[in-house]
């Protein structure tokens, strides 16, 4: 069993911890978070320090790390932490819950989380650091851009393309062959039956431009 350290102790971390414990592949050393969280516990795990301690733990021989901060809208903290981990030399594995179904013909980038009872079907391509959350379905031949979040119970029908850092809300449905741009938010329960441009918020039939983009070079 390999050691792993987790970044961020919030609600999403609870789900990821469950999946790691279930698979039995990694031994969780603890969490890193903000100074305000130092010493706090979740189950048997403690917040050991801030992300400034990443180098120290890497030097101690811990080579695996995972970002357990959830999707933060227009923020790019997940992106920044991922880059920090890779610059130090950490491996950022995929965490796939034992109840999830992932096709052998699907492609997953680094740091993908696949939650309980989620499905990723044949020829789907999932970008680095995506979250495919509890009960979500990503059907055949879909492409999900890096740092995107397919939320609880949402359905991405066959051949759909989703851009980078886009949030597909809980129980939303994207009809087959549609394209959704980058930096979008699709509200919970929304049915997407037409293409969506970059930087759009869509709730039901209401759509507006967000006016923000994420600078991936920050």
What are these regions (language model features)?
Residues 3, 27-29, 64, 91:
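Residues at the starts of beta-strands that form the adenosine-phosphate
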Residues 39-97, 101:
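Phosphate-bearing ligand-interacting subdomains
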Residues 23-42:
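NAD(P)-binding Rossmann-fold cofactor-contacting core
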């Amino acid at each position: 069993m390999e050691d792993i350290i987790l970044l961020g102790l919030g609600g999403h971390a609870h789900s990821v911890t469950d999946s790691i414990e279930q698979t039995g592949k990694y031994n969780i050393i603890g969490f890193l978070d903000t100074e305000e969280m130092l010493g706090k516990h979740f189950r048997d795990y403690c917040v050991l320090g801030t992300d400034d301690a990443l180098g120290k733990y890497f030097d101690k021989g811990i080579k695996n790390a995972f970002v357990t901060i959830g999707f933060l809208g227009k923020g790019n903290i997940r992106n920044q932490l991922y880059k920090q981990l890779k610059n130090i030399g950490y491996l950022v594995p995929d965490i796939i819950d034992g109840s999830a179904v992932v096709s052998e013909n699907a492609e997953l980038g680094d740091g993908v989380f696949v939650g309980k009872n989620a499905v990723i079907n044949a020829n789907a391509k999932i970008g680095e650091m995506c979250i495919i959350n509890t009960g979500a379905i990503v059907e055949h031949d879909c492409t999900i851009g890096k740092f995107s979040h397919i939320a609880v119970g949402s359905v991405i029908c066959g051949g759909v393309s989703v851009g980078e850092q886009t949030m597909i809300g809980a129980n939303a449905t994207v009809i087959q062959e549609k394209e959704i741009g980058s930096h979008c938010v699709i509200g919970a329960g929304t049915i997407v039956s037409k293409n969506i441009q970059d930087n759009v918020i869509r709730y039901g039939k209401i759509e507006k431009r967000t006016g923000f983009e994420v600078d991936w070079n920050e």
